[in-house]
Amino acid sequence: MPRCAPCQAWTLQQFLFFVFASFECLLCLQAQQTNALVAALLLLAFAFLERRKYLPATLFIVITGFIKLFGFGAILLFIFYPQKPKLALYTLLWIAVLALVPLVVVSPSELWGIYEAWQTQILGDHAKYAGMSFFGMLGSFSGMNPPKTLLLGISLVLMLLPLIQIQKWKQPWFRQLVLAALLIWMVIFNHKAESPSYVIAMMGVALWFFSGPRHWPDVLLLLFVFAGVSLLFSDITQVISKGLRLSLSFEGTSFLLALELWQRHPPETTR
């Protein structure tokens, strides 16, 4: 966990952070997927941004974008840091480098065909799939195909709305909460989300919880999400036919709470 979070017992918090996410990491590894890697790279990128080490930070973000396209959403974090032209330049540099790396093993025409196929797939599957996302849950409850583009736009506006509090941008806890909400949003509003994807969202929940002092309602919510996503799911999936939808409801709750927390004023800390 990035050290920007205020903490009194760093070692204990670090241990609890990874225990909280370990179940979803194990599921991701068993499924042979890269979601845990994406989550780790985004956390590393944030840590390097906090230390003003922009070259590795932008590299990690671009790598996540090439693995999972939504990883490019972490570029949003650039608004919090100085030297934005340098951040933009480094990002474009890494995009160019990674986009051309496959030329080591394929021809330019083959690479162009791969990118065209990638674009076709991305543009074509948005209308076909809902996955374990908010769209999937809404569709299963209503029996209708929800307007994904509209709902995605609304959710994006709601997530970005707290950024109008410019006076909080200098607070480490605020930047950490923005990252937490971004990690959760990437999953619950991703039409291709599946069970292994939730390691990313669970990292967001952990970042939210360890962003400042907590009270019993916060602890209960954390345990509720942990049990619903990482524990109960594996036990009841054989009993409830739509058990895959359960994890979304818990992540949705944590996402709404993260938005609420942005209106609070924890003790301010400065770098």
Region spans (language model):
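Aromatic-enriched
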Residues: 209-271
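Juxtamembrane/interfacial segments around transmembrane helices
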Residues: 43, 65-71, 120-123, 139-148, ...
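Hydrophobic transmembrane-helix microenvironments that flank and shape a buried ionizable site
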Residues: 30-32, 65, 248
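Voltage-sensor/pore transmembrane module of 6-TM cation channels
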Residues: 52-82
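Transmembrane alpha-helices and membrane-interface helical segments
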Residues: 40-51, 77-78, 82, 87, ...
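Primarily membrane-embedded glycan-assembly and transfer machineries that use lipid-linked glycans
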Residues: 1-56, 81-198, 202, 271
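Alpha-helix initiation/capping motif
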Residues: 22, 74-80, 107, 206, ...
